[in-house]
Amino acid sequence: MFETQNSNSIGAKIVNWVVAALVNVFRSIPFIILIVLLLPATQALVGTIMGPRAALPSLIISAAPFYARLVQIAFDDLDHGVIEAAKAMGATRWQIVTKVLIPESSPALVSGITVTTISLIGYTAMAGAIGAGGLGNLAYLDGFQASNNAVTMMATIIIVIIVFVFQFLGDTVVKKIDKR
């Protein structure tokens, strides 16, 4: 999206509009509804609509547009003077992406990975509640359905701890790579 958003080419503008629209559509569908909407495609892709493998298409289709938007924001927040300087020195598009955009926005990209990972942890818990297994399944079936609040609470605490660990790791990496 970043590469095509400021282009004067009609083709690039169309590509940008289509990709941005798809990102917005898939970001706006609640995950539990996305799982249900993708059941036929999930059956065709992985051969089942139950279990951990069945959760993968929905997890990928929900996470990819989410992270794509975070990447676009990270790239948009860069000092455009740095990009213009690279262009003035004759850098190719590939060189601008690999030598300027990614290195300069790496703290924001890692933060985006952290946020996306934490969102995926929540999504996997939701997927577990409808048969994908894991802590969500445990909390729902053995906790909520069995009226066992202790199991629900324990699964929730474990999920919270996992989120804290990923947030700590992401923050640590960002601090190490941030040049500011």
Language model features: what each stretch is:
Residues 93-123:
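Transmembrane alpha-helices
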Residues 1-19:
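Transmembrane-helix boundary motif in ABC transporter permease subunits
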Residues 24-27, 31-66, 151, 155-156:
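Loop-to-helix entry region at the N-terminal start of transmembrane alpha-helices
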Residues 123-159, 178:
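Glycine-rich helix-loop "coupling/hinge" segments at transmembrane-helix boundaries
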Residues 53-57, 61-83, 113-114, 121-125, ...:
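Membrane-embedded alpha-helices of multi-pass transport/permease systems
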Residues 14-26, 74, 139-143, 173:
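Hydrophobic alpha-helical segments of integral membrane proteins
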Residues 3-6, 153-180:
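C-terminal transmembrane helix and the adjacent membrane-cytosol boundary/short C-terminal tail
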Residues 75-105, 145:
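Short helix-to-coil transition segments within interhelical loops
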